[in-house]
């Protein structure tokens, strides 16, 4: 009876060692779960970026509005009959700001 108990205890010890410290044990499971969580976050960011790019492609393929918006913003184009206005900061405010900075530096 004593030999059987020792054999079962040794088997139990070996199984516990395999479970906690062996290959594919709890430590590996936790590490892999952390890696999966990091990768899922990265995948979510990339999926959002891809969705945005696909939406932009759909706009460019199907709509004039996206083409007009891009021409206005990137090429500074205007439609016939439109008036282009450029808003510039007030010169007196800019001079006052620069003179106050000069006074602070002295």
Swiss-Prot record:
Superkingdom of the organism of origin: Bacteria
Membrane disposition: Single-pass type II membrane protein
Cytoplasmic side of membrane: 1-3
Example of a GO biological process term: FtsZ-dependent cytokinesis
Keyword list, A-Z: Cell cycle, Cell division, Cell inner membrane, Cell membrane, Coiled coil, Membrane, Transmembrane, Transmembrane helix
Record's GO cellular component terms: cell division site; cell septum; plasma membrane
Periplasmic topology ranges: 22-106
Function in brief: Essential cell division protein. May link together the upstream cell division proteins, which are predominantly cytoplasmic, with the downstream cell division proteins, which are predominantly periplasmic.
Subunit organization: Part of a complex composed of FtsB, FtsL and FtsQ.
Family indicated by similarity: Belongs to the FtsB family.
Protein name as catalogued: Cell division protein FtsB
Protein's organism: Serratia proteamaculans (strain 568)
């Amino acid at each position: 009876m004593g030999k059987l108990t020792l054999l079962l205890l040794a088997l139990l010890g070996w199984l516990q060692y395999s479970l906690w410290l062996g290959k594919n044990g709890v430590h590996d499971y936790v590490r892999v779960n952390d890696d999966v969580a990091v990768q899922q976050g990265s995948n979510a960011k990339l999926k959002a970026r891809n969705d945005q790019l696909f939406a932009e492609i759909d706009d460019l393929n199907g709509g004039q509005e996206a083409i007009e918006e891009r021409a206005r913003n990137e090429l500074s184009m205007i439609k016939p009959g439109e008036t282009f206005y450029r808003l510039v900061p007030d010169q007196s405010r800019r001079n006052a700001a620069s003179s106050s900075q000069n006074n602070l530096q002295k």
